Amino acid sequence: MSFYEKFTANYPRNATDKFFDIIKDRKFDGWLDSSLNLITDMQLRDADMWCLFVEQFRTNPDIVDAGWRGEFWGKMMRGACFVYSYSKDKALFDVLKESVKDLVAAQDELGRISTYTVEKEFDGWDLWSRKYVLLGMEYFVEISDDAEFNAMVIDCMKKQVDYLISRIGWVSEGKLQITKLTRHWRGLNSSSILEPIVRLYSLTGKDKYLDFADYIVACGGMDVENVFELAYRDEMHPYQYPVTKAYEMTSCFVGLLEYYRIRKNEKHLTAIINFANRVLEDDFTVIGSAGCTHELFDHSTVRQANPDRGDPRAQETCVTVTLMQFFYQLNLITGDPKYIDAFERSLYNGYLGAVNTDGAIDTTAAQMYPELKMVPMPFDSYSPLTAGIRGNGTGGLKPFADGRYYGCCICIGAAGIGVAMKTAALTSKSGVVVNLFEKGEITQPLVSGDNVTLKIDTAYPVDSKVKITVDTDCDKEFEILIRNPEWSVNTAVLVNGNAVTAPKGYISIYRKWVSGDIIDVNFDMRARAIFPIPYGSQILMNKVIWGVNYMVPTFDKEHPSTQNHIAIQYGPLMLAQENRLGYSVDDAVSVKVEDDGYIDIIIPETKTAPYNCAFEAKIPTTDGEYFTVTDYASAGKLWTNTSKMAVWFNTK
């Protein structure tokens, strides 16, 4: 289907968005592409796993533990569709289409596709899982050109939602209140179904789906407070809300963003932007995730260097990927590059760090579930900040009847690399937008219908130089926007050897482009020191009273050694210590920081790290010595103490 025509999920964006993610053709040849290929080979083409996911809808296993096995199919389908939109891998598409066909066949006579029986539905994670079924189908329709098949899938979705509408709505009408249809998070998880409901309205034009979306928004996301009103009023931080579950809350705001595209209520856009800005200010760490208390907002911007938080589960991959998708959507609708600055931090640090490149096995899960068949999974679930290890458990692990298992973070991971490929280059109303700098070739359509090809030659993110060669048959003037990252203080830009100004945000170059024109960009990648933000003590909402669906306040005190930490940023990369680099990450070091806050690192011509890494550097100490670090995403991949690591270094 054409991406932005009428009766597509994206059609409303024509009236509201600044940028458009129309992928004509692109092929990269770097870190992102190799990661995507690994994920595709290790996970997305596994037809047997797709069959297992569908089987859950026939056997209803989630009634036993009010579980979320029903989310796995749609979560992974959405990510796989993002990946396919870049790779155009026919073998992958065939696997996905067969799985969609299989799932449609699992629909019951009431129109339901659920891992819960009718008698036990609307409990636990039922609506949350149905959300993902709908999203998976909606995103498949985007990549499919088979009109007859797509019509069958859309009809399947209509039946699913028609059943929901018949049961869920205003209590005064004898229906069930959506925020009460779960035993968790005061209804945030169930309310996040808003996103696919709005998209289904755009696909069909049926007012009853928009009416249902109106109802969901009016309920406010929680049964104890209206989360959208809290964000609109902007009087408190998300970590102070009555429920602080980062993944589910952000998912609700993604849904509100889709809803804004239809209703165009500026109050809702204000709420969305307020929420995003609060997260960036208060709950966004150096590796681009949120939450030092597993997956809760907890003022992690200031807490991230605390060495003793009591639980190694932090910086959940589900949170990282959901934030990436949120930032991508915010960039589309606002045109603000700060959201891509945040996206890039997540991508090159927290996200790529979670990719299981070394095929490690989660020993924590193996000890807890000795009966399960443990195999390497494509993604880790949590990421360390102070000295710690990867592999601290499989987030959202659910066993299957045959002894296999899966988890929430494993399923969502593919969406991260897929949305990165979408975000890399966009179309604006006046030209094209270059957001990410990956070696390769991008053909991007202009709104006029003409195409422009950008050939990008670079070793970014480990090198500062980016060369972009323009190839176009278009005889019109158009604009090329190049993101100038916030960390690059002194960016230099040349067009055919002539200097142009490089303001913060986007560098706008508007001209009549000729094939062979060259843009040379040199970013300021000096390594800089980052220090913890002192906070003393505070009250958080990060204690869950399980069984009664309550969160209660806790007193949080800054650890005495928190301020004895330092983090080092090189371009978009955070640098990490690792036990295999010839020292213990538990030992204190004394980093030599210059008066201007920068660090004179040495980048060796030949890497010496005993593991594959994207970047390696020597860090000077105050006593004239050096110690070796690598990029954060490459460190810690054994998931054991042998590869213990830290992005926040303990200092003397």
Which residue stretches match the model-derived regions?
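Accessory beta-strand-rich segments of carbohydrate-active enzymes
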Residues: L481-I507, K512, V521-D524, R528
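Short linear capping/connector segments at secondary-structure termini
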Residues: S114-F122, Q177-L181, Y232-H237, H294-H299
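Helix-terminus loop motifs that line ligand-binding clefts
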Residues: D48, M76, K90-L127, D283-H294, ...
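Alpha-helical junction/boundary sensor with strong preference for TPR arrays
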Residues: S87, Q107, S144, L164, ...
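Aromatic (Trp/Tyr) and acidic
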Residues: S2-K90, D123-A147, G187-L203, D207, ...
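Asp-box/WD-like beta-propeller blade repeats and closely related beta-sheet repeat scaffolds
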Residues: V118-L127, L134, N150-L188
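C-terminal beta-rich recognition modules with glycine/proline-rich loops and embedded aromatic residues
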Residues: A213, I272, I340-D463, A502, ...
